[in-house]
Regions:
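An amphipathic alpha-helical interaction segment
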Residues: 77-84, 100-164, 170-171, 175-184
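Short, Lys/Arg-enriched, disordered terminal segments
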Residues: 1-6, 250-254
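Residues that scaffold the ATP/ADP-binding catalytic core of kinase and kinase-like folds
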Residues: 44, 87-90, 186, 198, ...
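Flexible, active-site-proximal loop/turn residues at the rims of small-molecule/cofactor binding pockets
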Residues: 64, 139, 254
Length: 254
């Protein structure tokens, strides 16, 4: 494989909490890494509960339903991120379990301190730590970009740059010289899903990111991504994520 990955760090934040840190039924569109500094936190998936041990780094893969809580307190740094071969093609296999590696308490403390300071040097350091962790968790047999995907790479890059609910398959196909029916069949063969499903996944990820890192109103987000109004955006998000934008924002104050 000769492709390089595209690493996008959504946010890296320090967190200190008590028993109010208690969330059920979380399922994210991004990956999350925890560097645990102190406390008695736990995570539960369908495979059972796991202690979040100080001095370790944990990967919670996108699409993994889980619960989070602590007995008395938790002190950690968390990083939400995407890592892709190209938009929509994840470079970390979605896992049915939480993965963990030793990091050391000193390393966890340095990462926590850097996340608090947020200088350019600190942000660069955090990105480097994240890249190191991603490399450690990445599978050896990661598939590359198939020949069937190659013709669509400019298209998905354009979708990423101009992401909108108003994008239409017919318009994209015509702009790149495809018959719409042939385009749909070839796209599905290459990616294992239809164009609309792929588009909705990218759009859901982007809206979720806006909800996490900005204070924009739903109306502002709706206007920015081609929805008629906040009601239609909320309905779309609830259909694709299973929860409302307001609840999603509240769940991720962690």
């Amino acid at each position: 494989m000769t492709e390089d990955i595209q690493l996008r760090l959504v946010r890296a934040l320090p967190f200190e909490g008590n028993t109010a840190w208690n969330y059920r039924g979380i399922c994210d569109v991004h990956h999350t890494i925890y560097y645990i500094l102190a406390g008695d936190g736990h995570i539960r998936t369908e495979k059972g509960a796991l202690d979040l041990e100080p001095g370790r780094v944990y990967l919670i893969s996108r699409g993994l339903p889980h619960d989070l809580w602590c007995d008395t307190h938790i002190r950690k740094t968390y990083m939400d991120f995407h890592v892709e071969l190209f938009p929509g093609c994840d470079a970390l296999a979605e896992a049915g379990e939480v993965r963990s590696l030793p990091a050391g308490r000193e390393a966890c403390q340095r990462i926590f301190d850097a996340a608090q300071r947020k200088t350019l040097r600190d942000r660069t350091f955090l990105r480097g730590q994240l890249l190191t962790a991603v490399a450690a968790f990445m599978p050896d047999n990661l598939p590359g970009i198939s020949p069937a995907m190659q013709p669509f790479l400019p298209i998905v890059e354009e979708m990423r740059r101009n992401l909108s609910a108003s994008i239409r398959r017919e318009e994209i196909a015509a702009r790149y010289g495809w018959n719409p029916s042939s385009f749909s069949r070839a796209f599905r063969r290459a990616f294992g899903c239809g164009f609309k499903q792929y588009q909705e996944r990218l759009l859901t990820e982007r809206i979720a990111e806006e909800l996490l890192v900005s204070n924009k109103t739903l109306q502002t987000i709706a206007e920015g991504y081609g929805f008629c109004d906040a009601y239609y955006l909320s309905a779309f998000f609830k259909r694709t994520m299973g929860t409302s934008p307001a609840i999603y924002r509240k769940q991720h104050e962690r």
